[in-house]
Amino acid sequence: MQQIPYLSKEFLSQLDAILDFYSKDSVETAWTFYSKLLERLKSISYMPYRFRKNKTINREDTRDLIFKGYVVVFRIEQDHIKILAIYKHNLTPYS
């Protein structure tokens, strides 16, 4: 069974801004983005090291999931996955 990883406050804040942006155009688009993203986040727990190593942090336990032009940064902890941030691929992370 795939579990939803731990979502950091920073990630939730960034996701809220993204969903707010999409919902201005279409609530359905925002909902579709959200539900598909959650499915991808659940899949991280299965072989998390298959994702690319984060280039900014450059730690073996910090990886990137690419989703619809966004980079989802996550850390592999001993007993769970922690989602750290989400940003558009062409923006500088953590700015």
Predicted region positions:
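Conserved acidic functional residues
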Residues: Q14, D64, G69
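GIY-YIG nuclease signature motif recognition
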Residues: F11, L37, F74
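Enriched for short, Lys/Arg-rich terminal
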Residues: F67-V71, R75-S95
